[in-house]
Amino acid sequence: MNPTAQRIHELTDLLNRYAYEYYTLDAPSIPDAEYDRLFRELEALERNHPELKLPDSPTQRVGGEPLAGFAEVRHEVPMLSLTNAFSPQDENGVFDHAEMYAFDQRVRDGLDGGNPEYVIEPKFDGLAISLLYRDGVLVQAATRGDGTTGEDVTRNVKTVSNIPLRLHGENVPELIEVRGEVLMLKADFAGLNKRQAENGQKPFANPRNAAAGSLRQLDSRITAQRKLHFFPYSIARQQGGFEAEEHIQELAYFQELGFSLPNGNFGCFKNIGEVLAFYEHMQQKRPELPYEIDGMVVKVNSLAQQRELGFISRAPRWAVAHKFPAEEALTIVEAIDVQIGRTGAVTPVARLQPVFVGGVTVTNATLHNQDEVSRKDVRVGDTVVVRRAGDVIPEVVRVIFERRPMQETAVAVSDGIGHQQDDLFAETPSAKQTESVPLHKPYRLPARCPICRSEIEREEGEAVARCSGGMLCQAQRAQGLIHFASRKAMDIDGLGEKQIEQLVAQDLVRHFADLYRIDIPTLQKMKETADKGSSENENGDAETVSGDLSKYNTQNGKKQPTKWAQNILAGIESGKTPELARFLFALGIRHVGERTAKTLAQAFGTLERVRRAPEPVLACLPDIGTVVARSIAHFFAQAEQQAMIDELLAAGVAPQAQAVSLPAAQYAGPQRWITRLPGFKISENKAQALWELAGQSIEGLQNDKALPADWQAWRSKAQNTALLENLKTFFAQMPSEDEAAQGSDGINKAVAGKTFVLTGTLPTFKRDQAQALIEAAGGKVSGSVSKKTDYVVAGEAAGSKLEKANALGVSVLSEAELLTLLC
């Protein structure tokens, strides 16, 4: 073997092993940068010597040129379906497992009274595929199709990171056909839909549709970008290798061969009672899983017993798909009205006849926006399918048009010579006819906000309509103030939703800064008015109206506020020095969540720099695309928003500056921000060339008359001239590289880059406070424990996360030890 071929073999083996460690074991042994370096070396060698490329080369995971179509594949062993079993819940949440007990009895009868063990595993909501390996190398992948014939999706499947291109271990068979499910993890689905929205493309309805659509792309490069995942669940045929006697052994064999398993979410049990207990446990755990499942699959564990039981029609007797309670149900739309959010978003909401679905009674369901209402043609009186998945807001999925209420209406009928039914001069009157038409008209959003009567507007290209009233709208004002004071924003202790709603309803608070002008008389007035409204309420439900503002002392016949009022004022005062990220999040800038607010704080360090940041610079930052950057820049460009911030500063609010750990100047190099200038399309290479032609200065971009004509035409527009001047001023006032480095030195090197998980109740800090301390020191906080976790900080009543940390050998810290590390 020549040196080049040998090096290609070495790199292929190395990179496949590293990918297995990363995607399957969750325990990478080399840094990402080293993997990337080796990958690029292999790419270069294969590009120069394509004849030496190996069938299991990891470079195949990036996809290739588009196909004209998919070839058909006939399954040697048919891909059969499973019989379904259901366990409906009553309104108390109690399951009726009659169908599963019947399944267990059928199995026992088929085994002449034998006592079967069962394996129970997730029923993934994805796309079934079959993987064929010969001598350990993946040679073919096919979809289920009709069970007999599927489609060849080999090229696309090779882009799925956790599918081994070559099998691992000592017991690699000569041939094995692995059946399993391709799916998209919830986090990857959310990321995909975010990118779809930013690119102006239609989002996917659910992870299953996204996975199916991604796997069947003719262009495998698109599939490679979609981050699909695979879990195996059965062996269709096998020659050589380890011969399992039980299904649970097959699952262990999959792991040995290099496949991922849904660890912790399957098990082997002695009887049906234990199986059903695990099913109920998984139904509760379902919303927390990283992937979608719609039930559990129960299989007889013994492969010999499986063969003895055999098949009926197109399904095995030894397995059943135990579906979770229906998360869809039928009900009737009683009314449609709208809700106004804090950004003015107008959301149509269906008011429903109460229906029990997904474990709760649902009375309202979102209709999202006018386009969705029109597309589904939802009307008052319609019978509709309502879906609720996990903690997702219930939504109307579709209308059952056959049940739509109709009415008869008269129609004019011609007599054949041009006269209509109501024509007084007709010689021969026509017979009266009627036609059946819907009782209710199609729904349309109101022209004006039902709260403030401001016009409802919808910008071109936007799906969501918005109330134009801004903070003049009581609904927006209340929601905006609730968000501003919330725990993850300004964290004003003692000031809850009900108090804010009362303050807004009584016009005592109109703007954020008004919160810092509240005094005892204001709170007294609010309480007295709330009490009056309570006493006039037909139900006399004072607690509902006034919330927790209900306690007064009486001295000399005069009402005195008790501790609740002082607590509110103390909470307002103590919240005047928030972290910069919290303050930015509290402002309620459209598209700016906690993560984006943290990015802005880490990139600029001070509020003043964030306020002045130009849109092209913002668009260069990590996880901030053009849509979000435009929204941030638009917010700070509005005089009323700048005035609102100035009012807050004048009221004593002082957002804390922080060390710059993501220096904006490093991310926003000239070749990057030039490509993000609005209305000017250019590649990064050409942007770099333009920058060099301009003498590597913004002044040159502004004034050099030798620059290309398209650039000169762009800069001649007034708004672009102003933008370039803004960019010049902004970069001139940004900290130098030395200053940025000094800021980075403030990061705790013992914590920087480390991943922490918080669990249990800490003795002193709330979790948000502990998270803020860790992030300020340069660390990261994750919600789950893995081999990548550096520290678990455990308080009282720490549960499964602490157990997993101990099992994985992850360092466990107390709050005191965390503080020592941070110092």
Swiss-Prot record:
Looking at the Swiss-Prot or TrEMBL record, what is one Pfam family this protein matches?
HHH_2
The protein depicted here goes by the name DNA ligase
**Catalysed reactions, semicolon-separated:** NAD(+) + (deoxyribonucleotide)n-3'-hydroxyl + 5'-phospho-(deoxyribonucleotide)m = (deoxyribonucleotide)n+m + AMP + beta-nicotinamide D-nucleotide
Q: Which GO terms describe its molecular function?
A: DNA ligase (NAD+) activity; metal ion binding
Q: Which UniProt keywords apply?
A: DNA damage, DNA repair, DNA replication, Ligase, Magnesium, Manganese, Metal-binding, NAD, Zinc
The Gene Ontology biological process terms listed for this entry are:
DNA repair; DNA replication
Enzyme class per UniProt: ligase
Instruction: Kindly list the positions annotated as binding Zn(2+).
Output: C449, C452, C467, C473
Output the Gene3D superfamilies linked to this UniProt entry: 5' to 3' exonuclease, C-terminal subdomain, 6.20.10.30, BRCT domain, DNA ligase/mRNA capping enzyme, Helix hairpin bin, Nucleic acid-binding proteins
